[in-house]
Amino acid sequence: MSWIERILKKNTITKKTNIPEGIWVKCNNCNQMIYKIELEKNLEVCPKCNFHMRISARKRLEKFLDKNNILELGKNLEPKDILKFKDTKKYKDRLYIAQKLTKEKDAIIVMKGSLYKMPIVAAAFEFSFIGGSMSSVVGERFVFGVNESIKCNCPMVCFSASGGARVQEALISLMQMAKTSAALSKLRKKKIPYISVMTDPSMGGVSASIAMLGDINIAEPKALIGFAGPRVIEQTVREKLPDKFQKSEFLIQKGIIDLIIKRKNMRFSIGKLLAKITNKPEPKKE
């Protein structure tokens, strides 16, 4: 027994209670503590300040698509360390860590399903997998999605969340920009709608290719969108950048994106847009 316990009465001493990890999440915007279950129910959007946190690709697609008849495309494709690349870590070690962390094989998931009973192909980037970087597998899976969209004559939607091309795959990664853009040109020739949704962040080679090539370009609130980051630009031009530079609210004022849609409204809003474009009955709000 410590000296303080001898002085104070036992009933006035409160012993420290260990709170299990993972119950509370701190919002990066308002710094408020949020009950994790409440945050998950709110689609990873802070109920205090409406800040859109990052959400996993699989969870995003599960909440976006109708519940039944979902087929994952290109799920057997896995990245390979063709260049035997090594920086501070070997590329194959980075892949192993990322796969263990995310339970995914690479940084994009592509699914064929339906949205309010309308056939659709949807893709989503997994930012937790090496920053959602574009690899050869990401490019190939995306092209799988485009080809399936052409085959079924159904719209395609892509949710971007990426830092750009994957450094560890060098020129192979850069080539995916041209490859995916060429695939989207086939979609356009067939007059099949492609909607791009840019989430935080959509940067680098992804923003310079598939993220900006939508027939309709949508963004989530306060998403960082651009090629180089604002800090890099500021250091290069040596000038103070405008407030909220490269944020979705800034870009919509400049006409770079078409719409800003909150995550909770995304499913219905895109369903409504696609129904109008494809001349289908307008969906009823759930």
UniProtKB/Swiss-Prot annotation:
Compartments where located: Cytoplasm
InterPro entries documented for this protein: AcCoA_carboxyl_beta, Acetyl_CoA_COase_Trfase_b_su, ClpP/crotonase-like_dom_sf, COA_CT_N, Znf-ACC
UniProt cofactor(s): Zn(2+)
Pathway connected to this protein: Lipid metabolism; malonyl-CoA biosynthesis; malonyl-CoA from acetyl-CoA: step 1/1
Swiss-Prot/TrEMBL keywords: ATP-binding, Cytoplasm, Fatty acid biosynthesis, Fatty acid metabolism, Lipid biosynthesis, Lipid metabolism, Metal-binding, Nucleotide-binding, Transferase, Zinc, Zinc-finger
Recorded family membership: Belongs to the AccD/PCCB family.
Function: Component of the acetyl coenzyme A carboxylase (ACC) complex. Biotin carboxylase (BC) catalyzes the carboxylation of biotin on its carrier protein (BCCP) and then the CO(2) group is transferred by the transcarboxylase to acetyl-CoA to form malonyl-CoA.
HAMAP family from the UniProt entry: AcetylCoA_CT_beta (MF_01395)
Subunit field text: Acetyl-CoA carboxylase is a heterohexamer composed of biotin carboxyl carrier protein (AccB), biotin carboxylase (AccC) and two subunits each of ACCase subunit alpha (AccA) and ACCase subunit beta (AccD).
Record-given protein name: Acetyl-coenzyme A carboxylase carboxyl transferase subunit beta
Gene name of the record: accD
